[in-house]
Amino acid sequence: MLDDQIFKTVVDSAPLISIDILIKKGNKILLGRRINKPAQGYFFSIGGRINKNEAIDNAMARVALNELNIDLKSTPEFIGVFEHFYDDSMYENVSTHYVNIAYEYEMEETPDLPTEQHSEYQWFAIDELLESKQVHKYVKDYFRN
């Protein structure tokens, strides 16, 4: 892990690469209300940064385990690459730029979800999340054609 001051410099100077896993059950998507900046307080897809020298598949497995408490049983379906620009970050007066790789993963049962990153979770129908003011605009982008 990077020292906090070095990581702050990275966030302030370069884009971060992240993975979002869109958890699907039937016609609904699982979203969590974010505790941390950026996008604090919004319902957002589950995801995390890719670490240096970490293969995408390994990052996906780590994020699924840490953020969802699940072991991936199959490879999630690739959705696309998206850019997320935020005016804030975990640091004061530092914006955030993510290059985000989105995947979709079908689940039959809801796992015991951790609460370190999200204060609550909710299943949204796609039309419902597209209309909700509580769902961040970048999540909505995954479902717009």
Language-model segments: residues:
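Active-site segment of metal-dependent pyrophosphate-handling enzymes
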Residues: 69-110
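Short secondary-structure boundary/capping segments
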Residues: 13, 95, 112-114
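A cytosolic small-molecule/anion-sensing beta-strand core signal
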Residues: 25
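Acidic, metal-coordinating catalytic segment for phosphate/diphosphate chemistry
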Residues: 1-20, 93
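Conserved Nudix-box catalytic region and its N-terminal flanking loop in Nudix hydrolases
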Residues: 28-70
